[in-house]
Amino acid sequence: MTNVLMQTSAGDITIELYTDSMPITAGNFLKLVEKGYYNGLHFHRVIKGFMLQGGCPHSKDPNSNRCGTGSPGYSISDEHLDNAKFSNEIGTLSMANSGPNSGGSQFFINTVHNSFLDWWDKSTPSAHPVFGKVIDGMDIVKKIESCTTGPNDKPTKHQKIISVKKS
C-alpha cells in the first residue's frame, strides 16, 4: 500500500493506493503521480450524490470543451481480480473508462456507494475497478461535491488539483 497526498484548491485529500492488490491500476496512477501528470489539472465532472472525476489532461484549462476526453496517450488493461473485489463504496478511488480496457489517467472518487459500477456485477455493463480509498480529507471531497455545476456537470467555480505526490 502506498499513500498519496492530493492538494486541491479546497484542501488536502490523502489516498491509500492498493498497490499490492491492484498493481496494474494503482501502479499506473502512481507512475503518473511520480511524473507530476495530475499537477494543475481540475475536477472536470462533479455530480452530487455520485462522484468527483478528474485526471483529464485537457482540464489543465478548465474552460476547455475537451475536458473529460483526454488520456495519457495509452490505455491499461482492466484489472478484474477475484481476490481484489473492492466495491465502489464511499471514498473509494476508481478507474474511469469508456469501455473495456480503456482506462488511462481519469479517475473518480465515489461520494456514495455506487455498487452498480462494480466490475463483477454482470447485470450492468459498467466495470470500474477500485484501486484506492480516501483515508483523510473526506470533508474536502464532500466540499468539492457540493460545488455548483453547469453543463456536463462541470464546476462553475474551478476545483483545481494543485499537486499529487507520494506521502
Predicted regions and their residues:
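Cyclophilin-like peptidyl-prolyl cis-trans isomerases
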Residues: 1-167
